[in-house]
């Protein structure tokens, strides 16, 4: 009998947490990684590791910007965001979170040893507190402030 792959076991547990938490994004992402791992597609892991985050951020940015591009948010609404205090505060928070995310990407790139903890924490946050799986970048950014790395 072949020994069970511990990495596969971890992925299965994380997929289970995704299912329990009813988070299809996490579940589908992990099941996709399992499929890649157990098929000849596993040769693409280096490429996925190198470009996956960038592609994910690109897709997320497209999703966030679509209401402006489609006209659902008009040009006048965008311009008004610079004069209303709540919108100005939203801009400041957006800048801060983007900055933290940038620090997070840098930390995750230069200190891969923290990635596992950040991922487990994010999946637990999604599973137990109905969070969303954008947490690793922001969490890594906050961690970089605590440990003094960028």
Swiss-Prot record:
UniProt cross-references to InterPro entries, sorted A to Z: UPF0756_TM (IPR007382)
Subcellular location: Cell membrane
Domain of life: Bacteria
Membrane topology summary: Multi-pass membrane protein
Keyword DNA damage (UniProt): no
Transmembrane segments: 1-21, 51-71, 88-108, 114-134
This protein's UniProt keywords: Cell membrane, Membrane, Transmembrane, Transmembrane helix
Name used for this protein in its record: UPF0756 membrane protein YE1142
Annotated source species: Yersinia enterocolitica serotype O:8 / biotype 1B (strain NCTC 13174 / 8081)
């Amino acid at each position: 009998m072949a020994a069970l792959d511990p990495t596969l076991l971890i992925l299965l547990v994380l997929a289970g947490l995704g299912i329990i938490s009813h988070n299809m994004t996490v579940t589908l992402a992990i099941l996709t990684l399992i499929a890649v791992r157990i098929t000849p597609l596993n040769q693409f892991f280096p490429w996925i590791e190198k470009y996956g985050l960038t592609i994910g951020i690109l897709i997320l940015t497209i999703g966030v910007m679509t209401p402006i591009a489609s006209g659902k948010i008009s040009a006048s609404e965008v311009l008004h965001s610079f004069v209303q205090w709540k919108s100005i505060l939203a801009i400041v928070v957006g800048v801060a979170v983007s900055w933290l995310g940038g620090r997070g990407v840098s930390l995750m790139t230069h200190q891969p040893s923290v990635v596992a903890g950040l991922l487990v924490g994010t999946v637990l946050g999604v599973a137990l507190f109905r969070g969303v799986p954008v947490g690793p970048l922001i969490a890594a950014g906050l961690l970089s402030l605590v440990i003094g790395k960028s």
